Amino acid sequence: MPRENATASHAESSQVPKPWDDFDGLGHYYQYRPEYPSAVAEQLRVMLGNWTGGTVIEVGAGTGLFTRSVATALGPTYRIVALEPNKDMRRHAASQTPAGMPVTYMDGIAENLAVADHSAQLLTAASAVHRFNRSQFYQEAERVLIAGGILAMVQYKPFDRGSAFADDFLSVIEGALPTYRRHRHSKPEGGYSEIDISGELKGLSTFQGVQRGAFVHHEQIDLETFMYRALSFTIIQKAMIATDRSHVMAQLFEIFDRHADQKRLVAMPYEAEIVTARRVDHALKS
């Protein structure tokens, strides 16, 4: 059984709200979230081609959706340390990860990684980096990655280009949250903003070879999957708090009914974006 290590790198007992508090009680809904396209983890496997094994650090692992995808692609020669500060998420991750996968789930945060210096070939975060203090996270990435090691950040979002259903779904959120606009992300301190991960990494002297890729995944889903998947998004939870839960739920039911086919399925497209960079080998540059 995958291990869950509760060793804390932050004060969980603090009463000050933390960005990960938003995920309390949402672990159950994550089983309805879409899988990450296998091509994303496969890209990382190819990029790690110079090594035959090693250590992967994942930050903000949630319920382990991306963790398991990476573990499957890389195989047993890579040990994955999956850090997740929300206890409910860690519990679901450990329970859903097959026995024998070389994964350890631990309490930990992006800004203070409980990882030895220069110990990892890959540091990754999936659907989480927008909640980090990224300047501190990038400093930690430089510290924990070996020379030539890979920093990879993945974002997964509804793809509204050419999809009336995805457009209507995002419009429900925009109508409930005046400061939210599609393609914006939650900020750690609250509110929403657009982020440019590629641009941020290109501005750092400690990383080079910044690349961006995108994979669009289309999926036919039924009403139950759609509703539970919607409830797994903190942005939907905030929309229900800002307006009225029953009103938001009624809107979601309505757009599903409007777009469902004869089999009571809707096409929900998602885009997975991956941005990668390599830690500079200063010895080679000098």
Regions found by a protein language model. Give the residues of each.
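Conserved class I S-adenosyl-L-methionine
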Residues: 2-51
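Conserved Class I S-adenosyl-L-methionine
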Residues: 3, 190-286
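Class I SAM-dependent methyltransferase SAM/SAH-binding core
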Residues: 55-59, 63-112
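Helix-to-beta-strand junctions that scaffold the AdoMet/dcAdoMet cofactor pocket
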Residues: 75, 132-133, 145-146
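A short acidic, Gly/Pro-enriched loop at the edge of an enzyme's catalytic core
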Residues: 111-122
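Short catalytic micro-motifs in class I SAM-dependent methyltransferases
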Residues: 127
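A short, conserved alpha-helix within the catalytic core of class I
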Residues: 132-140
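Conserved catalytic/acceptor-binding region of the Class I
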Residues: 142, 146-219
